[in-house]
Amino acid sequence: MYSTLSDSQREIVFNKLGKFVVRACPGSGKTYCVGARLARLFHGWDKKHEGIAVLSFTNVAWQEIEKKCGDKFNIGKIPYPHFLGTIDSFVNKFIFLPFGHLVLGCNGRPTLVGEPHGIWSGGKYDRDPKKHFDICSFDIEDKIIPIGNVQAFGFHWRNNDGSINGNVVNLEKAKKELLGKGYANQSDANYFAMKILEKYPQIAKAIAIRFPYLIVDEAQDTSDIQMKIIDLLIENGLSEVMLVGDPDQAIFEWNDAKPELLNQKFSEWENSIVLNENRRSSRKICSFTFSISSLGSASISVNEQVCEFAHQPKVVTYNNNNIQQIISDFIEECQQYGINVSKESTAVIFRSKSIINEVLNIPEIAFRTNVWKDNYTREFARGKFLYDNGYFKDGFKIIERVLLKTLLDLSYCSENNISDVISRMGFINFKSQIYAFINSLPQSNVPIGAWIIAANKFLKEKNCKFEFQIHNDGSHYTFPQLFLNEGKQIVEKDYRYGTA
C-alpha cells in the first residue's frame, strides 16, 4: 500500500521523528503523505486511551485525508482514541468547551455563536454594540479587533489622531459582558483556549498525554494564536509534531494566517524537510512558478504524462477594466487546446475575495455602505437567497434558526431551542411550517428593497409581530451583490471559480 511513495515521502512516512516541518510544493502529494503517515502509525497503534490528532483548516481538507486513508490504506472512519478534524473542532472539543468557564467566569459550558455555529442577532437597537459580538474578538496581545466586514460596524476603528474610537470602547465593554454570560465566537474560542493553556498548564499536559502525536495539514494557514496553542502543548510534553504546508499558498482572508510562523518552525526544527516533487504540473509550469515562489529551487516535474507538456505559462497584469477580457481569452485558449470547459476541467482562481465582483462582473457595494438595520433581516434574506439558488439545506437551516430567534426573542438559537419547539409541535409539523414560510417569501431575483416590501406585505398578512428593515441607501442592491462571499458557486458559470 506504500509502493507509490517517493523516496522523500517514504522518509517522512517511516523515518521522521520528533518535531519537523514538511514544506510541500504544489502537486507534491502532501495529503497522500499525511494519510500514509497516519496509516503507518494507526496500523501499529496499541494504546487504548491515547491517540493521534490529525488537524486541518477546513472540513473538505480533513475529509480528503480520511478518504485517502480509506481508499489507499484500508482505514475506514478514524476511531477513538484518535482524532481527525479541523483545528477549530479540536480546540473546541478538548480545550475551550470543557474548560472555557475557567477563564470566562460563566456558569457551565460556553455557547459558541456566530459563523459557522449559528446566527448571532443580539442587540436591541440599531447602534447597540452587542449587535457586533460575533464579528470582533481579541488578538494575541489582548487587544479587541474586527474579524468580520469592517463596514458592518458603522464607525471607524480609530480616530483621525490614531486614538481608539469611543465606539470601540463601548464594543469591548459589551463584548466582555456577553463573554461573562458564556457566549463566544470561534475566534474567541481560540483566544481563550490559548489563555486556558497558559493559566492551567496541567490541562496542556493532559492533552499532550492524550494525543502524543500531532499532525497539522495546511499549516501555512495557522494564526499566531493557533501556533501559540501548539507551542504550549509542546512546552508541556508534546514531542511528536509534524507540520505540513506551503507558505506560498496561505489563505489570509478568513483566519489571520501567518505563513511566516511555519517558516520559523522550518528553520528552528532541524529535522524539517522540503517535498518538492510536483506530480501535477509540467516542467515549464514548475519553472515558471519558481519565479514567484519563496522556494530555494524549482519543484521537479515527475509526472511523465504532463512533464513535457509544451504550453508556455503566461503572465498578464490585470485591472478593473480588463479582467473580463482576460477571462474570456483564457476560456477561448482552453477551447483551442481541445479542453471541454466545465467545472470539472476549468477554473478561474483568484487570490482575494476582494476582486470577486470584478471577476463575476457584478457591481461592488460602495465602501462604508451599511445595508442592514438588524442582523435578522440579513439572515432571512441570505437564507432565502441560498434556498432559491439550490442550497436548500443551508437556506433552510438559516431561516429555521433566525425565525425561532425572532419569534422567541433569543440572541442565539441552539439545538436545544429547536428540540424544545419540535417536542411541542411535532417534527413533521414544525419542519412543514418552516418550509411553508420559506416558500411564501418572495423570490430573491429582485433588488433587496423590492424584496423587503413584498416580504413585509406577506408578514403583515400572516399577522407576524416583526418586519424586515434596511437602510434606504442600500435598497437598490441585488442579492448577488449582497451575498457574493458565501463561498458557494452562486453565480452560474461554465467553469469553477473561487479563491486559491
Regions found by a protein language model. Give the residues of each.
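The feature marks helicase ATPase cores and/or their adjacent C-terminal helical subdomains
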Residues: M1-A500
